[in-house]
Amino acid sequence: YEVERVLIEEVDSARAKGGMAVVMDTYTGDVLALANVEGAVADVPAHSAPADSRNRVLTDAYQPGSTAKVITIAGALEEGLVNPNSVFHVADSLKVGDHVFSDNEKHAPVDWTVTDILAESSNVGTITIAKSLGKTRLDSYLRTFGFGVKTEIGFPGEASGILLDPKRWDSTSIGTVPIGTAIGVTVLQMLNVYATIANGGVWRQPRIVAATVDAEGVRTDMPTSATRRVISTSTARQLNDMLREVVKRGTGTRAVVPGYSIAGKTGTARKPLEGRRGYSNDYMASFVGFAPAERPRLAVAVVLDDPGTEIYGGVVAAPGFARIMQAALRLERVAPSTITSDLPLKKATATLTR
């Protein structure tokens, strides 16, 4: 109920057509809460479930945008091509094939570390790293992280998403795919990428039912979720630290939760036109992350469909993430961080009474 209530308020505040949110236990893979709502601007009753009763978190594929950049970075780290402090000379645009890719904000050529590239959500920097990784290895990491296949969570109509075989990529695909366009994922698939990082690099199959209780009150626990290692513990730890920087000083500063360290990433992507090539002027805005970063317990994804106020995930989706994460941490009684939270420090004075 709390997740849906917050999502409704955030969808209304952003004047979005709708929204989706999921909360997952990173230890078990259990989905603790999920919500799908329609906004007041949609051509359906406000705050209703989707008109055709789809659970969009599981059944609808969307282009994730920059939340998917973490997979390119993960692959490059795992292959030993870069480390978090590797420096790249990054311009604000780069031609790949017949398309020019640009960063969201114009800037002079700058020397950025890989951590900076992720924190600033640089398209050019990410594509540069992806080109060194190569399409075959990039595709392998996308699939190992769970893209292109169903999670097999057991929900009817679950989508597998859209991920073309590298043999079918065109000359611009090494630019589009690494930054989360020209692919389609469900919200659950995207959330599970971050849960995998939180879980030390081990992918765990999501579970929506932990146990059943029969008419006589006998409880039967469901089998433990299947697992597989995707990246090393060392790579996962590096990504954890880098994703914290996104929230501390990058595009995700509005995702801060007082008292807790947050790791996560913003995402913004234009929606494809229906039934034909090209893109509309509508956007999907998102934030996906986990907490407490030093001892992850919960992962949360918030996605807003075509927000009418601002388009960027760091502006319109991150605040909803923070509210839902804060509520989930409280309800699950997760202890505050043992290290400094991501709130800026303020000077204060105090008088001692003897």
Spans of features found by a protein language model:
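Conserved, well-ordered alpha-helix/loop/beta-strand core segments that scaffold catalytic motifs
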Residues: 1-19
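A helicase ATPase "motif cassette" and its flanking acidic/Ser/Thr-rich regulatory loops
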Residues: 3, 117, 321
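Beta-lactam-recognizing serine transpeptidase/beta-lactamase-like catalytic domain environment
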Residues: 19-66, 71-306, 343-354
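Short amphipathic alpha-helical signal-transduction/dimerization elements
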Residues: 198, 247, 322-329, 333
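Glycine-rich phosphate/pyrophosphate-binding loops
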Residues: 203-204, 332, 336
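A short acidic/glycine-rich loop-to-helix N-cap element
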Residues: 307-316
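Short, flexible loop/turn segments with low-complexity composition
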Residues: 335-345
